[in-house]
Amino acid sequence: MAKMQGRMQGKVAPGDDRGDGLKEKMVAINRVTKVVKGGRILGFAALTVVGNGDGGVGMGKGKSREVPVAVQKAMDEARRKMIKVSLKNGTLQHPVIGRHGAAKVYMQPASEGTGIIAGGPMRAIFEVMGVHNILAKCIGSTNPYNVVRATLNGLQAMSNPAEIAAKRGKSVEEILGLEK
Protein backbone atom coordinates (compact mmCIF):
# COMPACT_ATOMS: atom_id res chain seq x y z
CA MET A 1 0.00 0.00 0.00
CA ALA A 2 1.70 3.13 -1.21
CA LYS A 3 0.77 6.45 0.34
CA MET A 4 1.20 9.70 -1.52
CA GLN A 5 4.39 11.28 -0.28
CA GLY A 6 5.70 14.83 -0.01
CA ARG A 7 4.83 17.44 -2.59
CA MET A 8 2.19 15.49 -4.53
CA GLN A 9 -0.15 14.86 -1.60
CA GLY A 10 -3.43 16.76 -2.08
CA LYS A 11 -2.25 18.40 -5.31
CA VAL A 12 -4.15 18.66 -8.56
CA ALA A 13 -2.46 16.99 -11.49
CA PRO A 14 -1.93 19.39 -14.42
CA GLY A 15 -4.59 19.19 -17.11
CA ASP A 16 -7.36 18.02 -14.76
CA ASP A 17 -9.47 21.15 -15.21
CA ARG A 18 -12.38 20.60 -17.60
CA GLY A 19 -13.49 24.21 -17.74
CA ASP A 20 -16.65 23.55 -15.69
CA GLY A 21 -15.47 25.70 -12.76
CA LEU A 22 -14.92 22.77 -10.40
CA LYS A 23 -11.79 22.35 -8.30
CA GLU A 24 -10.33 18.85 -8.20
CA LYS A 25 -7.95 17.32 -5.66
CA MET A 26 -6.44 13.89 -5.43
CA VAL A 27 -6.55 12.65 -1.83
CA ALA A 28 -4.83 9.26 -2.09
CA ILE A 29 -3.54 6.70 -4.55
CA ASN A 30 -3.21 3.12 -3.39
CA ARG A 31 -1.18 0.49 -5.24
CA VAL A 32 -2.59 -3.02 -4.95
CA THR A 33 -1.29 -6.35 -6.25
CA LYS A 34 -3.12 -9.48 -7.26
CA VAL A 35 -0.99 -12.62 -7.14
CA VAL A 36 -1.74 -15.05 -9.96
CA LYS A 37 -0.04 -18.18 -11.31
CA GLY A 38 2.13 -16.17 -13.71
CA GLY A 39 3.22 -13.56 -11.16
CA ARG A 40 1.72 -10.34 -9.84
CA ILE A 41 -0.82 -8.01 -11.45
CA LEU A 42 -0.52 -4.38 -10.36
CA GLY A 43 -3.57 -2.20 -9.94
CA PHE A 44 -4.26 1.27 -8.60
CA ALA A 45 -7.10 2.77 -6.56
CA ALA A 46 -7.58 6.55 -6.46
CA LEU A 47 -9.58 8.70 -4.03
CA THR A 48 -10.46 12.22 -5.19
CA VAL A 49 -12.63 15.14 -4.11
CA VAL A 50 -14.29 17.75 -6.34
CA GLY A 51 -15.87 21.05 -5.27
CA ASN A 52 -17.33 24.22 -6.74
CA GLY A 53 -15.82 26.60 -4.16
CA ASP A 54 -19.29 27.55 -2.89
CA GLY A 55 -20.33 24.68 -0.62
CA GLY A 56 -20.63 21.96 -3.25
CA VAL A 57 -18.42 18.90 -2.73
CA GLY A 58 -18.23 15.30 -3.88
CA MET A 59 -15.92 12.32 -3.38
CA GLY A 60 -15.11 9.56 -5.82
CA LYS A 61 -13.15 6.32 -5.95
CA GLY A 62 -11.70 4.81 -9.09
CA LYS A 63 -9.81 1.59 -9.78
CA SER A 64 -7.74 0.64 -12.80
CA ARG A 65 -4.48 -0.93 -13.92
CA GLU A 66 -3.10 2.55 -14.69
CA VAL A 67 -3.00 5.61 -12.42
CA PRO A 68 -4.44 8.21 -14.86
CA VAL A 69 -7.44 6.00 -15.69
CA ALA A 70 -8.12 5.36 -11.98
CA VAL A 71 -7.91 9.10 -11.23
CA GLN A 72 -10.25 9.93 -14.14
CA LYS A 73 -12.82 7.36 -12.96
CA ALA A 74 -12.62 8.81 -9.45
CA MET A 75 -13.08 12.39 -10.72
CA ASP A 76 -16.12 11.35 -12.79
CA GLU A 77 -17.71 9.63 -9.78
CA ALA A 78 -16.99 12.66 -7.57
CA ARG A 79 -18.77 14.94 -10.09
CA ARG A 80 -21.81 12.64 -10.07
CA LYS A 81 -22.01 12.41 -6.26
CA MET A 82 -21.78 16.09 -5.33
CA ILE A 83 -23.68 17.38 -2.30
CA LYS A 84 -24.50 20.97 -1.30
CA VAL A 85 -23.51 22.33 2.11
CA SER A 86 -24.67 25.75 3.32
CA LEU A 87 -21.72 27.81 4.54
CA LYS A 88 -21.68 30.97 6.65
CA ASN A 89 -19.04 33.57 5.67
CA GLY A 90 -16.53 30.96 4.49
CA THR A 91 -16.90 28.71 7.54
CA LEU A 92 -19.40 26.23 9.03
CA GLN A 93 -22.76 27.09 10.60
CA HIS A 94 -21.97 25.36 13.92
CA PRO A 95 -19.62 22.70 15.39
CA VAL A 96 -20.35 19.22 14.07
CA ILE A 97 -19.05 15.66 14.45
CA GLY A 98 -18.97 13.18 11.58
CA ARG A 99 -18.47 9.44 11.90
CA HIS A 100 -17.75 6.63 9.48
CA GLY A 101 -16.33 3.30 10.57
CA ALA A 102 -13.62 3.90 13.16
CA ALA A 103 -13.00 7.45 11.91
CA LYS A 104 -14.47 10.34 13.87
CA VAL A 105 -14.04 13.93 12.70
CA TYR A 106 -14.70 17.04 14.78
CA MET A 107 -15.22 20.28 12.80
CA GLN A 108 -15.69 23.72 14.30
CA PRO A 109 -16.28 27.13 12.68
CA ALA A 110 -13.40 29.58 13.07
CA SER A 111 -13.10 33.36 13.04
CA GLU A 112 -11.88 35.28 10.00
CA GLY A 113 -8.14 34.95 9.40
CA THR A 114 -7.77 31.55 11.08
CA GLY A 115 -7.32 29.59 7.88
CA ILE A 116 -7.86 25.88 7.37
CA ILE A 117 -6.50 24.02 10.37
CA ALA A 118 -7.13 20.43 9.36
CA GLY A 119 -5.09 17.45 8.35
CA GLY A 120 -4.69 15.54 5.10
CA PRO A 121 -7.97 14.42 3.50
CA MET A 122 -10.08 16.94 5.46
CA ARG A 123 -7.97 19.85 4.20
CA ALA A 124 -8.52 18.78 0.58
CA ILE A 125 -12.30 18.73 1.10
CA PHE A 126 -12.39 22.17 2.73
CA GLU A 127 -10.18 23.71 0.03
CA VAL A 128 -12.33 22.52 -2.88
CA MET A 129 -15.65 23.37 -1.23
CA GLY A 130 -14.71 26.97 -0.44
CA VAL A 131 -14.24 26.90 3.34
CA HIS A 132 -11.58 29.45 4.32
CA ASN A 133 -11.66 29.33 8.14
CA ILE A 134 -12.15 26.11 10.06
CA LEU A 135 -10.72 24.05 12.92
CA ALA A 136 -10.92 20.28 12.38
CA LYS A 137 -9.54 17.25 14.17
CA CYS A 138 -9.50 13.61 13.14
CA ILE A 139 -10.03 11.19 16.03
CA GLY A 140 -9.58 7.44 15.69
CA SER A 141 -8.85 5.96 12.29
CA THR A 142 -6.88 8.12 9.84
CA ASN A 143 -7.65 5.92 6.82
CA PRO A 144 -8.23 8.48 4.00
CA TYR A 145 -11.40 6.75 2.72
CA ASN A 146 -13.02 6.71 6.17
CA VAL A 147 -11.89 10.26 7.03
CA VAL A 148 -13.37 11.65 3.78
CA ARG A 149 -16.64 9.78 4.36
CA ALA A 150 -16.80 10.91 8.01
CA THR A 151 -16.18 14.53 6.96
CA LEU A 152 -18.94 14.40 4.35
CA ASN A 153 -21.33 12.71 6.83
CA GLY A 154 -20.68 15.51 9.32
CA LEU A 155 -21.16 18.23 6.71
CA GLN A 156 -24.44 16.65 5.57
CA ALA A 157 -25.67 16.47 9.18
CA MET A 158 -25.05 20.21 9.66
CA SER A 159 -28.24 22.27 9.60
CA ASN A 160 -28.67 25.93 8.76
CA PRO A 161 -30.79 28.46 10.70
CA ALA A 162 -33.56 28.40 8.06
CA GLU A 163 -34.07 24.64 8.49
CA ILE A 164 -34.17 24.92 12.29
CA ALA A 165 -36.60 27.84 12.12
CA ALA A 166 -38.92 25.88 9.80
CA LYS A 167 -38.85 22.86 12.15
CA ARG A 168 -39.69 24.96 15.20
CA GLY A 169 -42.22 27.19 13.44
CA LYS A 170 -40.27 30.35 14.25
CA SER A 171 -38.54 33.04 12.23
CA VAL A 172 -34.83 32.93 11.44
CA GLU A 173 -34.32 36.10 13.53
CA GLU A 174 -35.79 34.35 16.60
CA ILE A 175 -33.46 31.38 16.11
CA LEU A 176 -30.40 33.61 15.76
CA GLY A 177 -31.46 35.73 18.75
CA LEU A 178 -31.67 38.94 16.73
CA GLU A 179 -35.32 39.64 17.55
CA LYS A 180 -36.20 41.17 20.92
Swiss-Prot record:
This is Small ribosomal subunit protein uS5. PROSITE patterns: RIBOSOMAL_S5, S5_DSRBD. Belongs to the universal ribosomal protein uS5 family. Signal peptide: none annotated. InterPro entries: Ribosomal_Su5_D2-typ_SF, Ribosomal_uS5, Ribosomal_uS5_bac-type, Ribosomal_uS5_C, Ribosomal_uS5_N, Ribosomal_uS5_N_CS, Ribsml_uS5_D2-typ_fold_subgr. GO terms for cellular component: small ribosomal subunit. With S4 and S12 plays an important role in translational accuracy. Located at the back of the 30S subunit body where it stabilizes the conformation of the head with respect to the body. Residues 1-20 are annotated as: Disordered. NCBIfam families: rpsE_bact. Keywords: Ribonucleoprotein, Ribosomal protein, RNA-binding, rRNA-binding. Part of the 30S ribosomal subunit. Contacts proteins S4 and S8. It holds the Pfam family Ribosomal_S5_C. The N-terminal domain interacts with the head of the 30S subunit; the C-terminal domain interacts with the body and contacts protein S4. The interaction surface between S4 and S5 is involved in control of translational fidelity. It comes from Nitrosospira multiformis (strain ATCC 25196 / NCIMB 11849 / C 71). The keyword Cytoplasm does not apply. It comes from the Bacteria. One of its GO terms (biological process) is translation. One of its GO terms (molecular function) is rRNA binding. Residues 22-85 form the S5 DRBM domain.
